[in-house]
UniProtKB/Swiss-Prot annotation:
Protein known as: Protein-export protein SecB
Cytoplasm found in the keyword field: yes
Pfam families: SecB
Record's subunit section: Homotetramer, a dimer of dimers. One homotetramer interacts with 1 SecA dimer.
InterPro entries listed in its UniProt record: SecB (IPR003708), SecB-like_sf (IPR035958)
Biological processes per GO annotation: protein folding; protein tetramerization; protein transport
Species assigned in the record: Marinomonas sp. (strain MWYL1)
A GO CC term assigned to this protein in UniProt: cytoplasm
Keywords: Chaperone, Cytoplasm, Protein transport, Translocation, Transport
Gene Ontology molecular-function annotations: unfolded protein binding
Subcellular localization(s) per the UniProt record: Cytoplasm
């Protein structure tokens, strides 16, 4: 086998090898609201935490995908909103060599799970800057959420 043929074969195998790497993490948007400040600081603090998650993804280049993890945290105290934090944590991921199902799973579960610690840290930082006690969100099983989402989609299409 010639050197050229070996090189082409190696390049073909490399192109088919699944690859997923994070190129960049960025904060796309962040918002903090504390509608009852400063009166809220005079009340006994018994927070009720509400959490909403959403993910978006889109292809932005050859094998390059933007994934955005959107998190909204609403904290109520005695039934009134103490604060609201909205974060859009973005990431650029280079993904190749995956079939459509694997790609969908990577974009819907793996990439958001990778972004979550960054979003959690940004949420915690802004809450503390708002003069509230630190909030450390518990880890989230994005694989389970992804499977649940698929099951809902399948149930809707069979109806």
């Amino acid at each position: 086998m010639s050197d050229t043929a070996e090189t082409q074969e190696a390049q073909t195998q490399e192109a088919q090898t699944p690859q997923l790497s994070m190129q960049r993490v960025f904060l796309k948007d962040i918002s903090f609201e504390s509608p009852r400040s400063p009166m809220i600081f005079q009340e006994e603090w018994k927070p009720e935490v509400g959490l909403e998650l959403n993910t978006k993804s889109r292809q932005v280049g050859e094998n390059v995908y933007e994934v955005v993890l959107e998190i909204t945290v609403t904290v109520k105290n005695n039934g009134n909103t103490g604060y609201l934090v909205q974060v859009q944590q973005g990431g650029l991921f280079v993904i190749s060599g995956l079939d459509d199902q694997q790609l969908h799973h990577a974009l819907g579960a793996f990439c958001p799970a990778t972004l979550f610690p960054y979003a959690r840290e940004n949420i915690d930082a802004v809450v503390v800057k708002g003069s509230f006690p630190a909030i450390m969100l518990a880890p989230i099983n994005f694989d389970a959420l992804y499977i649940e989402s698929l099951q809902k989609q399948q149930a809707e299409t069979t109806q």
